[in-house]
């Protein structure tokens, strides 16, 4: 992915002052191409809305961010990156699950559920949040196995976030995915603007998120920003059942026993990206001046390859790797409906997107991280 994994939850934190940001009284950017002024957002009528305010709202000394997270693969590295850049105690990570030790002791951690609107709203208010990163979603194959849960997390959770972001004038980031396209979309390359028509609940919910975010931008002035992630490859997490997870599984299996069974056809080409590039792009689009954004949802890409091409690159490190293909019909049908290659020229032009990792560098990096005490180290 571009696919979020696991259960709903979130992370948040305070982001230090950026000299490119406007004065404190307006800590978010808005951008609109139409001539009408955005309408004022009317918040949900919770009991607290009916009570008079005792004082004017307080603005934070520096921007603050809240990240909803459904998985550790993306949100934990994102939180760690922000902590390194902005301070350990300025980013608070949260989930509905008990965190592992390395997450818990790395910085502040609290509990929250993306479906609990009142609790999320209290967190935004109590911590004076100004940036929000919304990652909660069930990924493609998992979502197909539990459509009601995917509908609740991916759509109802999004509605909670949109309302909170609009009410409190937040800068909102929502990741989208290659799964937002369908079999009638142009596949090679796939432009930012084209017919989508996905055939998974995950993809449908992501198109819904893109369009709702754009609607809230034009209707209420919400500073909505979205990136369509390709398949994301990381050494820091185990594969989680996604259609592109074969590209992570191959490294673990190659190191463990020198054998790999691929659940996609050998020539199935999909756009991919190393996680460091994914995090780099996410931070870059959030820091980009609003005036530089010509659209609200951008494709980003780094490389495109097939399982066979990945296998050949892996064999440069483990020549004796044995590969078999046992195609999973569900995952193959999903992959066949997705882009083969992303056109990300708008992101490169508008806010200077540039990837760092190609296929060779990705494979070498994965083995350097995973293989230091393994078969790779013995071979080398």
Which residues fall in each region the model found?
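N-terminal Rossmann/SDR dinucleotide-binding element
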Residues: 2-4, 9, 15-23, 32-35, ...
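C-terminal substrate-binding subdomain of Rossmann-fold SDR/epimerase-dehydratase oxidoreductases
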Residues: 263-266, 270-380
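NAD(P)-dependent short-chain dehydrogenase/reductase
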Residues: 211-270, 275-279, 283-284
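Conserved Rossmann-fold NAD(P)-dependent oxidoreductase catalytic core, especially the SDR/UDP-sugar
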Residues: 128, 134, 152, 159-201
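SDR active-site strand-loop-helix element
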Residues: 68, 94, 132-136, 172-178, ...
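Active-site YXXXK catalytic motif of short-chain dehydrogenase/reductase
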Residues: 72, 154, 202, 206
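NAD(P)H-binding glycine-rich loop region in Rossmannoid oxidoreductase-like domains
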Residues: 114-153, 164
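Conserved catalytic-core motifs of eukaryotic protein kinase domains, centered on the activation segment
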Residues: 103-105, 142-149, 183-188, 238
């Amino acid at each position: 992915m571009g696919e979020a994994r696991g259960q709903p939850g979130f992370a948040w934190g305070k982001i230090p002052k950026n000299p490119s940001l406007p004065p404190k009284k307006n800590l978010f950017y808005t951008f609109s191409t139409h001539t009408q002024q955005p309408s004022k957002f009317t918040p949900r009528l919770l009991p607290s809305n009916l009570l008079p305010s005792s004082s004017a709202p307080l603005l934070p000394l520096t921007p603050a961010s809240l990240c909803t997270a459904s998985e550790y693969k993306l949100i934990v590295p994102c939180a760690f990156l922000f902590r390194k850049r902005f301070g350990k105690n300025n980013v608070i990570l949260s989930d509905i699950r008990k965190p592992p030790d390395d997450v818990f002791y790395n910085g502040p951690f609290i509990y929250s559920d993306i479906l609990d609107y009142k609790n999320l709203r209290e967190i935004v208010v109590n911590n004076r949040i100004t940036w929000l990163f919304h990652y909660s979603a069930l990924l493609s194959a998992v979502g197909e196995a539990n459509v009601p849960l995917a509908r609740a997390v991916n759509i109802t959770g999004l509605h909670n976030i949109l309302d909170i972001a609009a009410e409190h004038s937040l800068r909102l980031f929502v990741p989208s995915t290659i799964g937002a396209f369908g079999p009638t979309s142009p596949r090679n390359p796939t432009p930012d603007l084209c017919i989508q028509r996905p055939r998974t609940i995950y993809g449908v919910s992501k198109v819904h998120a893109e369009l709702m975010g754009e609607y809230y931008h034009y209707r209420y002035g919400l500073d909505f920003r979205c990136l369509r992630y390709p398949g994301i490859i990381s050494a820091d997490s185990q594969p989680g059942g996604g259609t592109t997870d074969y590209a992570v599984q191959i490294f673990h299996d190659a190191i463990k026993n020198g054998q790999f069974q691929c659940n996609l056809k050998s020539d199935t080409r999909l756009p991919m990206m190393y996680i460091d590039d994914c995090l780099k792009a996410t931070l870059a689009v959030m820091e980009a001046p609003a005036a530089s954004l010509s659209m609200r949802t951008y494709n980003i890409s780094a490389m495109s390859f097939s399982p066979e091409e990945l296998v050949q690159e892996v064999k440069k490190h483990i020549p004796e790797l044995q590969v078999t293909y046992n195609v999973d019909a569900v995952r193959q049908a999903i992959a066949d409906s997705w882009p083969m290659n992303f056109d990300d020229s708008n992101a490169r032009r508008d806010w200077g997107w540039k990837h760092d990792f190609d296929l060779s560098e990705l494979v070498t990096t994965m083995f350097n991280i995973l293989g230091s005490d393994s078969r790779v180290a013995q071979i080398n």
